[in-house]
Structures are given as structure tokens and as C-alpha cells.
Curated annotation (Swiss-Prot):
Residues 82-93 have a biased composition (Low complexity). Phosphorylation at Ser-260 amplifies the promotion of protophloem differentiation. Keywords: Cell membrane, Cytoplasm, Developmental protein, Differentiation, Membrane, Phosphoprotein. It comes from Arabidopsis thaliana. Residues 1-27, 78-99, 168-203, 242-276, 360-428, 446-512, 526-558 are annotated as: Disordered. Potentiates primary root protophloem differentiation. Regulates roots architecture. Residues 400-423 have a biased composition (Polar residues). This is Protein OCTOPUS-like. The gene is OPSL1. Residues 180-193 have a biased composition (Basic and acidic residues).
């Protein structure tokens, strides 16, 4: 019975005791032979970990050793074998339960380099803490320098934070106890502080009242404030106007150009002259004045080389775009030959089925031109265009020809004029006579040069029908390499070779009746008369002088035509 009674409390104690862990082989370390452990030596591990801690003590020796830290104690508790099987009298196998703090389950965290034990005791940071942002911002710069400091703070906080919390709680408890003991002292102190504050507030309030009464808003202050506000407003208004000015050209019509330029004239700062040739309008822009409108035309109505009316439009027919030859004919000059009309006249040909045909001009010659056969019309149109070109070149050649002429007729005219100047009483009569002769001379010269231009620019068939045969020309005196190379009389005449022979053989008065007909008989009759009159007045040889002047005018005419045609 005693055995059963003795066994009963033993079984109860065994049930209350924790379950026994399996037996582990305990080993010892050479540096620490008195400690028993399984696995790693906790003392050696603590010594290695203490190397990272700069404030840690030197490695403990067997003779003098400081008490281990909490991390060392926790490591020893984890790695030391259980003492359920054996009871050591030294007490090294069991750790006192009161020395260890109470372990509680917390949130999971990732720890390295001894941060696990410090993270459990480190207080949670608030959201308004700025240290985290600063660390993240300066992490790439101060990472190496701040790692050691963070580790030191973590290790120190593992021990010191607990002590601080305990001391704060103790201070709070002491304050509560003192408050319970002496409540009257606190009330008296508070009442005395409130009274002092009221005394301080009263003079401040009185001072504010006095200051507000003495200082009243004056008219000057009001005016100054008004002017300052007005100045600020004016500055803002100026800025707003500048912004609007900048926005206006951006929002303008015409691809960034101001609206005033369109239809009114150019208003930009570009002062260089601009010239443009268009099929529908004529524009000359010099400086800021421009005339760019299809309604205004500077072209005089005229008949072109192909028979179309160029100039102002009519209701019956829409004109064709101007050709390249119209550039030469643009100059509105007075017609000396009186063959091309200056104003169009519409003459419809009667007929029920025939369309309306526009016939410009009012002279009989123009009507004959449009009602005649097409072959003669083609030749006459070419002659007319060439006569217009000759008039253009005549303006530039009058001065040079009058100053550099070498003919006998011109010299005789000059000598006659000098003699007339010497005789004062017969000056008016002789001057009138010689002026009439000079006019006839110029008229005949113009007609002769017109015929030359018409021959040079007409078709090859017309040229060969009115000129000598090619073998005779090649075998003649003036035949040269230029004539053999080119099959055109234009280059041959412009070069100047053989012009006298051709003139004498073609245009002499003897051959005039011998089958060589002219296009315009009236100018040729004038030339015959003037040749006879000028030959009698100047002593003969007038034909040679006219031939030289015609050759010069021919060369000048070709050069001017080339200049004008370069515009395209």
C-alpha cells in the first residue's frame, strides 16, 4: 500500500512535467572544456558575433569573464542539451527562468546579422517618422557609412528600450501616487498660473485697443494703396497684352502670316523686291507695295503670232494662257508701222451654223489678214511679231546708231546741219528740210530692218523661195566654214559675213521687178523712193550704209531677245 501511495504522486508529477526530449550526445570545446553542448559551441559563436559589435568586450577568458549578454544566453539555451536525464550540481546545464524575458509570438520578419533578436524588442516606428524616407533617399550615397550605425542602434535598442519602457511606467506610477497624495498643491499651482496669464493678457489687450484707436486710415494711405494696386494691375495688363500679341500670329490665317497681308498688300519686314510671272496675274512686289490681282492687267489687247486675242477677256470666248512670245510683246509701245491695231473690235461672220469669230482691229489690212488664206495669215503673223520685236530693239539702238553711223548719207546730213548752223538767216528753212529728210531716212531704215527681221525668222521654205540657191551662196565670195556648218541664214546674217552681197543681189531696185515679191509693197515703195532721194542728196552709196546699220540692229535684236527669254 505504501508503494502504491508513493507511486501515485510520482505519476502525477510526471504527467505535469513536460515531455522528455530524446537524448543528445553532448560534446565539449577545447576553448571551453567546462561547457557541454550539442552542435556548435555557444561561447565560440558569441565570440565570433561579438566581432561585429564594436562596443562589445574583448573575448572572455577563463579567469575573468563578464556576464553574458541576452543574445549569448538565448543561444546557449537553444543549443545546450536538456537536463532532464542528469542533474548537474554546478548549474551550468540549466538557465535561470527569471533572467530570460517573456517570449511572445510576434509578426514574421526577415532578419540577418543578429537583427532577429533586436527586431522583436525594437518599437514600431510611426508613419510620420522621416528617418525612413531620408534613409531611402540617401541609400545609394551613404549606404556603406550607415550600415554600421544601424546595426549599433539595433543592438543597443534590444536591451536599452526595455529598460526605458520600464522606467517610464515607473515614473507614471510614481506621478499617479504623488497626485493621489497631494491634490491641493496642484490645484493651487494651476490657479496661480492662470492668474498670472490674465494679468499679462490685460495690458496687451489695452495696448491693442489704444493702438487701433490712435492709428486711423488716412486719405494718403488709401491713395497710396490704390496707386499700388493700380500699378500692379497695369503690369498684369501689359503682360496679358504681350501674350495676346504672341498668340495672334500663331492663330493667324495663311500659314503663320498676318491677316493684313492677304488681299491688301505685304506688311512684313521683307524689303527685297519680288518678281513673279504667272499665267493668270502679273505681280511686282517692291518693298511693301504690291499689286497682285488678276482683275488688273497691264497688257494691251493685241494679236499674237498664232492669231488669238490676248488681253482683256470677252463674253464670247475665253482667252488662252499667254505664250512665251507674249513676254517680248508686253511693252505698250506706239506702233510706227500702223499695221497692228491698238483696240479690238468684234466682227462676227454672218451664218447660222458658223460659230462667232472675233476679229480684232478696224483697219482693212487687219480684216484681210483674218479673212485671207491660212498660208498668208501664217506669214503675216510671223512678220508682225518680228516687227514688234524690232520696235523693242529700236529704242535701245537709236542712240548707238545715231552716234556711230558711218554712212555717207548720215555724214552728209551732219555736214548739212553744221552748214545750216553757220548761216543764221537760212537756219529755219534748212533745218526744216533736213529734218524732213532725216525722218524719211529713218522711216526707210525701219522698213528695211523690218523686212530683214521677217526674212530671218520666217520658215525655211519662204527663205529659199526669196533667196539665192545654196550652191551659189557656197561658191560666192562670202562662203565660209560658218555657212557650211549651219543650215540657217539667221546665223549667217548675224555673223555679218556676206551681208552686202546678199543685200545687193536680193534687194536691189533692178531685181525688185524680177519675180522677188515683197510681203508689204507699201514699205518697199517707200524704200525705193528714199533710196533714190537719199542717194541724190548724199552722193550715192546709201544702200551700203543701210546694210551696216541693219546688221548692227540685227545683232542687238538677237541679244535683247535672249535676255528677255531668260525670264522663263
Amino acid at each position: 500500500m505504501n508503494l502504491s501511495a508513493d507511486q501515485a504522486p510520482v505519476t502525477a508529477v510526471d504527467e505535469l512535467a513536460p515531455p522528455s526530449q530524446p537524448h543528445r550526445l553532448s560534446t565539449s570545446c577545447d576553448l571551453h572544456p567546462e561547457e557541454r553542448f550539442s552542435g556548435f559551441c555557444p561561447s565560440c559563436l558569441c565570440d565570433r558575433l561579438s566581432v561585429l559589435d564594436h562596443n562589445a568586450a574583448p573575448p572572455p577568458s577563463s579567469s575573468s569573464r563578464k556576464p553574458p549578454s541576452i543574445s549569448a544566453v538565448s543561444l546557449k539555451a537553444l543549443f545546450k542539451p536538456s537536463s532532464s536525464g542528469t542533474n548537474n550540481s554546478n548549474g551550468n546545464g540549466r538557465v535561470r527562468p527569471g533572467f530570460f524575458p517573456e517570449l511572445r509570438r510576434t509578426k514574421s520578419f526577415s532578419a540577418k546579422n543578429n537583427e532577429g533578436f533586436s527586431g522583436g524588442f525594437e518599437p514600431q516606428r510611426r508613419s510620420c517618422d522621416v528617418r525612413l524616407r531620408d534613409d531611402e533617399r540617401n541609400l545609394p550615397i551613404n549606404e556603406a557609412a550607415s550600415v554600421d550605425k544601424i546595426e549599433e542602434e539595433a543592438r543597443e535598442s534590444s536591451v536599452s528600450e526595455i529598460v526605458l519602457e520600464v522606467t517610464e511606467e515607473a515614473e507614471i506610477e510614481e506621478d499617479e501616487e504623488n497626485g493621489e497624495k497631494d491634490p491641493g498643491e496642484i490645484v493651487e499651482e494651476k490657479s496661480s498660473e492662470i492668474g498670472e496669464e490674465e494679468e499679462e493678457l490685460k495690458p496687451m489687450k489695452d495696448y491693442m485697443d489704444l493702438y487701433s484707436q490712435t492709428k486711423k486710415p488716412s486719405v494718403k494711405d488709401f491713395a497710396g494703396s490704390f496707386f499700388s494696386a493700380a500699378s500692379v494691375f497695369s503690369k498684369k495688363l501689359q503682360k496679358w497684352k504681350q501674350k495676346q500679341k504672341v498668340k495672334k500670329p500663331r492663330n493667324g490665317v495663311g500659314g503663320g502670316r498676318p491677316q493684313s497681308e492677304i488681299g491688301v498688300g505685304r506688311r512684313s519686314s521683307d524689303t527685297d523686291p519680288r518678281f513673279s510671272l504667272d499665267a493668270g496675274r502679273f505681280s511686282v512686289d517692291i518693298g511693301r507695295i504690291s499689286m497682285d490681282d488678276s482683275r488688273y492687267s497691264l497688257d494691251e489687247p493685241r494679236a499674237s503670232w498664232d492669231g488669238h486675242l490676248i488681253g482683256r477677256t470677252t463674253a464670247a470666248r475665253v482667252p488662252l494662257p499667254p505664250s512665251m512670245l507674249s513676254v517680248v510683246e508686253n511693252a505698250p509701245l506706239n506702233r510706227s508701222d500702223m499695221q497692228i491695231p491698238s483696240s479690238p473690235s468684234i466682227k462676227p461672220i454672218s451664218g447660222d451654223s458658223d460659230p462667232i469669230i472675233i476679229i480684232p482691229g478696224g483697219s482693212n489690212q487687219t480684216r484681210d489678214y483674218y479673212t485671207g488664206p491660212p498660208s498668208s495669215r501664217r506669214r503675216k503673223s510671223l512678220d508682225r511679231s518680228n516687227s514688234i520685236r524690232k520696235i523693242v530693239t529700236e529704242l535701245e539702238d537709236v542712240k548707238s546708231v545715231s552716234n556711230s553711223t558711218t554712212t555717207i548719207d548720215s555724214n552728209s546730213m551732219e555736214t548739212a546741219e553744221n552748214k545750216g548752223n553757220q548761216n543764221g538767216d537760212k537756219k529755219s528753212r534748212r533745218w526744216g528740210k533736213w529734218s524732213i529728210l532725216g525722218f524719211i531716212y529713218r522711216k526707210g531704215k525701219d522698213d528695211e530692218e523690218e523686212d530683214r527681221y521677217s526674212r530671218s525668222n520666217s520658215a525655211g521654205m519662204v527663205e529659199r523661195s526669196l533667196s539665192e540657191s545654196w550652191p551659189e551662196m557656197r561658191n560666192g565670195e562670202g562662203g565660209g566654214p560658218k555657212m557650211r556648218r549651219s543650215n540657217s541664214n539667221v546665223s549667217w546674217r548675224s555673223s555679218g559675213g556676206g551681208s552686202a552681197r546678199n543685200k545687193s543681189s536680193r534687194y536691189s531696185s533692178k531685181d525688185g521687178e524680177n519675180g522677188m515679191l515683197r510681203f508689204y509693197l507699201t514699205p518697199m515703195r517707200r524704200s525705193w523712193k528714199t533710196s533714190g532721194g537719199s542717194g541724190g542728196g548724199g552722193g550715192g552709196g546709201g544702200g551700203g550704209g543701210w546694210e551696216k546699220t541693219a546688221a548692227k540692229a540685227n545683232s542687238h535684236g538677237h541679244s535683247i531677245a535672249r535676255r528677255v527669254m531668260r525670264l522663263y
